[in-house]
Design a protein with these regions (language model features):
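Active-site-adjacent pocket-lining segments in enzyme domains
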Residues: 1-25, 29-125
């Protein structure tokens, strides 16, 4: 998550994919990359989207349990919500979400369900 939200090249690729109606798939903290679409005064292209994201409440605890070496410098869910995203999960669980061409999974626990959802969605389209 560190560095990717500030990378204008990531934002360019994501805007290109959205313009081409291609699917974007993220897991856990992956939606942090979506923040890059808002760089250089560009509008945030995922405003009003629903998604599952690793919860900020769990990020606050991860250094204590050894998941991360230190505290996150900012709160991902908070930033996404401030940009108009509707976070549909509260826990770091196996929940997934699909909204338009964006497919998301809440945490590593969602990897299997996310893979199934992505595969089935791509096969249908």
């Amino acid at each position: 998550m560190l560095g990717i939200p500030e990378d204008p090249n990531v934002g360019k690729v994501l805007r290109w994919a959205k313009d081409k109606d291609l699917y974007t798939i993220t897991l856990c903290h992956g939606p942090g990359a979506l923040l890059s679409t808002n760089l250089d005064a560009n509008p945030f292209i995922y405003k009003d989207y629903k998604m599952t994201v690793f919860p900020d409440t769990v990020d606050k605890q991860t250094p204590m349990i050894g998941y991360l070496p230190g505290h996150m410098p900012w709160r991902l869910c908070e930033k996404l919500t401030d940009l108009g995203v509707k976070i549909v999960n509260k826990k770091s669980d196996n929940s997934t979400c699909i909204d338009r061409q964006l497919i998301t999974g809440a945490s590593p626990l969602a990897a299997n369900e996310l893979g199934k959802l992505a595969a089935n969605t791509l096969l249908q389209n």
